[in-house]
């Protein structure tokens, strides 16, 4: 069976096993541990970390860093052996590196993220467009800005 069609099984901490098909776009949400708003500087650092592995471990289509949570729309890339990077590995790295950055910035230590996260595998272009619009409109719905493009911590991939 070609590697493109293989499924890999991953055990999520405290959750049932998930199967990951190669190159499926996923919508991911993860929240701040205490739900107290991040400072603007912390949001800068988190967005920077989200963009760090874009084109290395995943194609990032969009990201928004809200005051107390993050939404990502991404497609995992393949590692040097041809396997797609797993969502658990992507999230562990992203949450760990962003926590390090925020803790350094704030002179604190320890976890900043809730242990669990939410992910939804997209199955159609329509679903992609719906999730992208949800992500873009999140700052508007929260009353943080009037237009998505006015929100500093929103990044959307430029399509050619």
Where do the model's predicted regions map?
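Short catalytic/metal-binding and nucleic-acid-binding patches
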Residues: 1-160
């Amino acid at each position: 069976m070609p590697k493109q069609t293989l499924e890999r099984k991953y055990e999520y901490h405290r959750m049932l096993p998930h199967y990951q098909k190669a190159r499926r776009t996923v919508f991911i949400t993860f929240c701040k541990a205490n739900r107290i708003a991040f400072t603007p500087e912390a949001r800068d650092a988190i967005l920077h970390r989200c963009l760090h592995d874009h084109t290395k471990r995943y194609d990032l289509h969009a990201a928004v860093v809200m005051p107390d949570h993050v939404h990502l729309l991404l497609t995992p890339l393949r590692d040097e052996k041809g396997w797609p990077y797993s969502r658990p590995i992507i999230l562990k790295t992203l949450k760990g590196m962003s926590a390090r950055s925020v803790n350094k910035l704030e002179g604190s230590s320890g976890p900043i993220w809730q242990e669990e996260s939410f992910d939804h595998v997209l199955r159609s272009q329509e679903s992609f467009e719906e999730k992208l619009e949800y992500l873009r409109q999140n700052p508007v719905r929260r009353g943080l800005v009037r237009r998505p493009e006015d929100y500093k911590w929103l990044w959307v991939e430029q399509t050619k």
